[in-house]
Amino acid sequence: MLNFLKIPIDIASNTSYTITRKINNEIGGIYDVDRKTVTNVILGKEVDCVPAGFWFHFPAEQHSGDAAVQAHLDLAKAIDLDMLKIMTESLMPYGDIRCAADWKKLKPFTRQSPFIVEQIDLMKRVCDKLGDDKALLATVHGVWASMFHIFNGPDCYEERRDALAATLREDRDAFRHGLDVVTDGLSLLIDEMKTTGIHGFYYAALGGEANMLSREEFDEVIKPCEIRLLREAKDENHFVMLHMCKDHLDLTRYADYPCDAVNWGIYSDNISLEEGRKLFAGKTILGGLDDRDGVLVHGTKEQIERRVAELMDEMKGYPFILGADCTLPTDIPYDNIRAAIEATRKHAR
């Protein structure tokens, strides 16, 4: 039995976990890995083994509609995942914001806005098929990410993020109007997501890069909106995982965010797992493996197994979910992901 820190939260105590998957490892142990296992780890409760969570963006032709639903179902069938993050590629619309003053023109979103309708349809259909088996996470693109999508579209973030920051500095009042509209729209989205059957939220936060926004800009403008959304997402039936994306992050900006679990890139010039345990004390950590290089992407089964064993020893006694810095390459061999998941069973204590 793995003993973790106790966190005083009660999530879905009356939830029925109807499907349990028993996984035999090479040393004869049998471990139950179900939705409750994932929830218990996130709450810091005792579990038999460490769960794992990995995800990647599907090809463009599988971003929406029937193809997107089938891509999630095929992945769940191909890899016996402990948790499935539903990849929502329907973003806030791009095209109307060209300069700082344009933010004042941004009109409120509604529950019928296409990006909300499309995301909710995908989640409902995936949850209808998988809801009794896997821990299902809804992806929420955070306020800074959504502002960027409206301003520039989904691509070239590193090249264009400073241009977005410049609109904040040029006309803060206009930017705040746009930010309020975006935050209200995400609030509607989160509320609708709770009707789909998901069990938790994966909030993808951008904007914490130390070399982009100042601490004052972040704390005064971005942080209050994110804390509002995280508080709205987190309730007795839904946990919240905070993903802090990109490199050169000032992670202290997120230390008091209301969430149950955290994930960041330890291979991206950010703090280590050990340092993160101190900064995010009491929160479950997901991560440990490089998402773009290293053993998970390029290694052999034996190399992956050794690295997972090292991570489990490093995180012994702390609530931990094996994962990667961020999304994996779309073309990563499924056998590599399977090897990492199987290694958590083999080295369970």
Region annotations inferred by a language model:
Residues 1-4, 105, 115:
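Acidic/proline-rich low-complexity IDRs
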Residues 3-13, 17-24:
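Short, positively charged and aromatic/hydrophobic N-terminal segments
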Residues 24-59, 66, 71, 82-86, ...:
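Active-site loop segments of alpha/beta catalytic cores
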Residues 64-69, 94-101:
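Glycine-rich loop at the start of a catalytic domain that most often binds anionic cofactors/ligands
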Residues 77-95:
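Short N-terminal amphipathic alpha-helices
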Residues 102-109, 161-162:
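A charged helix-plus-loop insertion that forms the helical arch/lid used to bind
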